[in-house]
Regions:
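Conserved class I S-adenosyl-L-methionine
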Residues: 5-67, 73-82, 175-176
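Class I SAM-dependent methyltransferase SAM/SAH-binding core
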Residues: 83-127
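A short acidic, Gly/Pro-enriched loop at the edge of an enzyme's catalytic core
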Residues: 130-138
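A short SAM/SAH-binding and catalytic strip from SAM-dependent methyltransferases
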Residues: 137-148
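A short glycine-rich, Lys/Arg-flanked "PGG" loop and its adjoining helix->strand segment in the class I
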Residues: 152-163
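Conserved beta-strand signature within the Rossmann-like core of class I S-adenosyl-L-methionine
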Residues: 164-172
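Core SAM-dependent methyltransferase catalytic element
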Residues: 198-216
Length: 216
């Protein structure tokens, strides 16, 4: 069961701490993503299989809903797409183009099994990847807390947005630095919509935000 109310002090429970521990294992002390081998090992051990569970449905539904209702038929870039959980939740006619990137080659290999004529999955580090095309929606789904300089990364990707394009962000409230990242994003970009979700069973909460460049 999920609600749109959030009580951070009660929701930083076991699930949130466990998720943070996974993220921390993918970091170096300077905050930069660790080698791809770390993420490969986690995917091989099934550490991220929970992203396909019912408890994640509400969060993914918000992101998919933003895409379907705010930019129907648009081109979508999904950074840190993992095994393609977001694309699986998108109707095939809801986008004209979908590109998913992830540091883990094994995750991308799984995602490619659902690839269609309008979608592409690439093994790439989102901190270094340079899009070769422009998009109507760029998604940062539980990614920004893993990056050394999340705001600069978002700024770089925004240059690949079409006019009127959107940035979609999902952050687990238990993830270290998430509140600061969200505050800085709200200062730099216009908030189109924001939803706070809490899952009572897993004791975890998220914030899903739709943003656009100022002045558009």
């Amino acid at each position: 069961m999920s609600t749109q109310s959030e009580r951070p002090n009660k929701l930083l429970g076991h699930a949130g701490r466990w998720l943070q521990s996974l993220v921390d294992r993918g970091r170096r002390s300077d905050g930069l993503l660790q080698s791809a081998q770390t993420w490969e090992a986690q995917y091989a051990a099934g550490k991220w299989d929970f992203l396909a569970e019912l408890s994640e449905l509400s969060r993914f539904s918000i992101l998919a809903g933003y895409i379907c209702h705010l930019k129907p038929g648009g081109a979508v870039l999904d950074t840190g797409c993992g095994q393609g959980a977001l694309q699986r939740r998108l109707p095939s006619d809801s986008y004209s183009r979908y590109v998913g990137i992830d540091l883990s080659a094994s995750a991308i290999s799984v995602a490619r099994k659902q690839q269609n004529e309008r979608s592409t999955f690439l093994a790439a580090d989102c901190e270094n990847y340079s899009p070769e095309e422009r998009f109507d929606v760029i998604v940062f789904n539980e990614v920004l807390c893993c990056l050394r300089d999340p705001l600069r990364t978002v700024e770089r990707y925004v240059r690949s947005l079409n006019s009127g394009g959107l940035v979609l962000v999902s952050l687990c409230s238990a993830a270290r630095g998430s509140a600061t990242i969200l505050w800085r994003l709200r200062q730099a970009y216009a908030t189109v919509d924001e939803v706070r979700l809490a899952h009572s069973g897993r004791k975890v909460a998220w914030v899903c935000t739709a943003l656009r460049p100022q002045g558009e």
